[in-house]
Every structure is written in C-alpha cells, then in structure tokens.
Amino acid sequence: MATLRADEISNIIRERIEQYTREVKVVNTGTVLQVGDGIARIHGLDEVMAGELVEFEEGTIGIALNLESNNVGVVLMGDGLTIQEGSSVKATGRIAQIPVSEAYLGRVVNALAKPIDGRGEIAASEFRLIESPAPGIISRRSVYEPLQTGLIAIDSMIPVGRGQRELIIGDRQTGKTAVATDTILNQKGQNVICVYVAIGQKASSVAQVVTNFQERGAMEYTIVVAETADSPATLQYLAPYTGAALAEYFMYRERHTSIIYDDLSKQAQAYRQMSLLLRRPPGREAYPGDVFYLHSRLLERAAKSSSRLGEGSMTALPIVETQSGDVSAYIPTNVISITDGQIFLSADLFNAGIRPAINVGISVSRVGSAAQIKAMKQVAGKSKLELAQFAELEAFAQFASDLDKATQNQLARGKRLRELLKQSQSEPLAVDEQVVTIYTGTNGYLDTLEIGQVKEFLVKLRTYLKKNKPQFQEIISSTKTFTEEAEALLKEAIQEQLELFLLQEQT
C-alpha cells in the first residue's frame, strides 16, 4: 500500500496556489422572453448599447435595435429556429463589422461578407465597421471627373461624375439593372473598382448578372454582395451598408470605386418589416419615421475625397422602383432629395422600343457638364434641349394637320437624334465613339437617311473611322478636346462613309 507523504502533498498545493491567477469576467447577459418572425425580445442585457451585437446560446448573432424600459428588441441575423424561450443571451461589446481586403475582388459575398460562391474563404486581416460616418465637408472636394457609363444618352445629357450620387428610377421591367450593369462593364480598363449590391432579388437574377460579368471579364474588378428574396429582413437591411464598407476600403486607399444598390425600395421594405415587428410607430405608407435617415446615412458615404486624402472616390448609383411611374411616392421622393440627380426610365418608351428607355425631359444631373470631358461638352451641349423641344413638338404635331417646312425638318431631326441614342444591352461605347455619334446627328448628316438606316450607318461609320483614321481616337484620348483637326478628320470620314453607304443601299 502506497504511503501518503505530507511534504509532497503540501508542495503540490503550494505550487497550485502560486500558479493561480484570479480572473473576474463580467458578462452582460439576458434571457429570451419571446422569439419569432426574425425578432427576439430579451429581458436583462441592462448595459447593452443601441446597435450592439448580441450572441444567443446556440450561436445566432443579433443586433439590439430597440432599448425599452423592461426589455430589449433584437433583430436576428439568421432564421433563429433553434433559439428557445428562456435561453441565455450575452452582449458582445462590439458593433457590426466586416473583414475587408483586395481578395474580395471577383467574389460573391453575403451581407456579413461571407463568401457564397463556393470558392473557399477570403483572406483578410483588416476590419471595417458596417456603419461608418460619412466624410465631412473638409474631407471632400467637388466632383470634376467623369464616370463614363458607355451609354450615349447618359454620358452626353445626364453625365455622372466620380463621387456623385445618381439615382436610377423607373417601373419594374424598364431596364434599370441593365443601365447599372452596363456601367460596370464599361469600367473595364478604367481602374475603377465596382461593387454590385443585390437586395431582395431572385437568386436566378443575381446568378444571371454574375454570369454576365464573368463572361465579359468584369468580375476581375467587381465585388457582388447578394441577399436574395428568401434572406432574413435583417440581412437585406444590412447588405447596402456592407457594400458601402467594402467600397470605402478602396476609396480610402486612393482608388476610384462605383457602387450600385439594386434596389433601395426592397431595403426600405425590409426595414419597414423589422420596425413593425419591433412595434415602432408606423408613419406614411407604414414606413417608420427614420426611413429617410436609413437612406441618407448610406448615400452620404459616397464622396470625392479631397487632395489631402488622395482624391479617391465612391460613386453611388442607387436604384428605386416606382409603381406606375409615380415618382411622388414616399421612398422615390426621399431618395430623389438625397441624390445629385436622377435617370428616369419610362415604361412607355421601353415598350415603344426606345432602349435604354431614358426620359431625357425629367432626368437630370445636378453636377452637369463638370462631369464631362471638353470634347463631349463641345458636341453635346444643345442635344438635351433639342430632344426636349422635339418631344414637345411631337406631342403637338399629333393634333396638327399641316406643318410648315421648318417644323417638319425639326421633327425629322428629332426622330434621328432619338434613334442614335438607342443602344443594345451590354454594348457600351467609348467616349470617342459617342462624340462621333452625337456630332453626326446634331449636324444634320443623318437627315438624308431613312430612320431605319441610322443605326446601321453609325456602326459602319465608327468601324470605318477606327480602321482608316485612328488619329481621331488618339486626339480625343490625349487632349480630351474636339479640336479643329479632329473635326476635319470626322467630317471627311462622314462624307466618305455616307457616299459609300448610299451607294451600297442602291445596289
């Protein structure tokens, strides 16, 4: 039988006492009172902060949004199906943040910046808060560089600048997403990082957009943040802020970024759902009172950084869906008042075959010609006014039987101008090609052609110019000005191509 040696036992006890470190850990905890519909009510959590992350016993994360006298309203970042009444919840002391890095380029992630494209984890050593304060007045400078969309109607008449917020608004199925995705495709080789945020869309639609980007090599400089229609309302509400945090990471590294929110109507609906379930008082159209702040704090993060901060930029292109063209509804008017202009897409124009279906009359860019190169200003200066006058005249001409020659000529010119603004989807044009197209139309070179021949002629003219007069493109690219030499080259090319085209049409 082994003997117990008292000195050994006392040595072991002494060692243990010497190694013992007293650690007091205070955890702010609470108990689940009620859970359901993506909302949990918690008793306790006395020192929780508004917007703080809380962790449930089974691992689900939530955000404390409602701090009431006897309970805390938490929105869940997941389905919460395994959370039970009476289970414990602890406050984490953190607010929502995501990892950020260059490795996110070319990836599809969710609102928590977790990859959902099946290509493994994304390496990141840095974190950014999902909700960051917008840059102040001193940190910004006015918008002066163009962000080319590749769409003639926009770049010539409703120009978008780097750091601007330009709303794309219209009914469903009018080509809003097409305008946004074409803008991303046109950034190839322009050193612009693009972020596409899909909120509450069908998974098939998001897959189609991603496939389009991959086929055209746009995923190299694009990040897609997607929360589809079956995602919890909390994640649909967070997705735009996640996209903004990713874009800001590049903006503060002196890079140019462009972010598309597709669409903010769905984010507002998700926020309305959360607010009503949290029993916040409803306002107009049952939206909560702070729905304006929901969008303003998001869109104010888009900026053109000052030269002290490296002149990076974040251009926001939010999309809002209207019902039967009603731009005076609550969410459309809110977002119109926050942004620096809007591109209005009309269902009537879309159905009439005018695509992109941009209503030039009520679309506007509050940055204006500051966001255009000099060459574009020179050729496109009057085109918006001419088109608006034509639309008015066309409406009047429906009731007039006999029109004078000048009016007939103006109508004929207007129809050809409208024709040259038509573009197929995913076929953006370079600036020099746009200058060629607009100059040809506004100077009457298309007046001798039938309307049906306009598109074909312009395609041939652009090809002819590229092949036979490459110096035209060089002048526009290097000087950004429509010089006399460039004009002479273009006039010569138009005359040569027009003669050739008419000859081919006769044979």
UniProtKB/Swiss-Prot annotation:
Alphabetized InterPro entries for the sequence: ATP_synth_asu-like_sf (IPR023366), ATP_synth_asu_C (IPR000793), ATP_synth_asu_C_sf (IPR038376), ATP_synth_F1_a_nt-bd_dom (IPR033732), ATP_synth_F1_asu (IPR005294), ATPase_a/bsu_AS (IPR020003), ATPase_F1/V1/A1_a/bsu_N (IPR004100), ATPase_F1/V1/A1_a/bsu_N_sf (IPR036121)
SUPFAM superfamilies: C-terminal domain of alpha and beta subunits of F1 ATP synthase, N-terminal domain of alpha and beta subunits of F1 ATP synthase, P-loop containing nucleoside triphosphate hydrolases
Coiled-coil segments on the chain, per record: none
Subcellular location: Plastid, Chloroplast thylakoid membrane
Lipid bilayer topology: Peripheral membrane protein
Site, as annotated: Required for activity: 363
Primary subcellular site in the record, as a coarse category: plastid
EC number(s) recorded for this UniProt protein: 7.1.2.2
GO cellular component terms, A-Z: chloroplast thylakoid membrane; proton-transporting ATP synthase complex
Reaction(s) the record says it catalyses: ATP + H2O + 4 H(+)(in) = ADP + phosphate + 5 H(+)(out)
Alphabetically ordered keywords of this record: ATP synthesis, ATP-binding, CF(1), Chloroplast, Hydrogen ion transport, Ion transport, Membrane, Nucleotide-binding, Plastid, Thylakoid, Translocase, Transport
Disulfide bonds: none
Residues annotated as binding ATP: 170-177
Matches recorded under Pfam families: ATP-synt_ab, ATP-synt_ab_C, ATP-synt_ab_N
GO molecular function: ADP binding; ATP binding; proton-transporting ATP synthase activity, rotational mechanism
Function, as annotated: Produces ATP from ADP in the presence of a proton gradient across the membrane. The alpha chain is a regulatory subunit.
Subunit structure: F-type ATPases have 2 components, CF(1) - the catalytic core - and CF(0) - the membrane proton channel. CF(1) has five subunits: alpha(3), beta(3), gamma(1), delta(1), epsilon(1). CF(0) has four main subunits: a, b, b' and c.
Protein family membership: Belongs to the ATPase alpha/beta chains family.
NCBIfam families: atpA, PRK13343.1
UniProt name for this protein: ATP synthase subunit alpha, chloroplastic
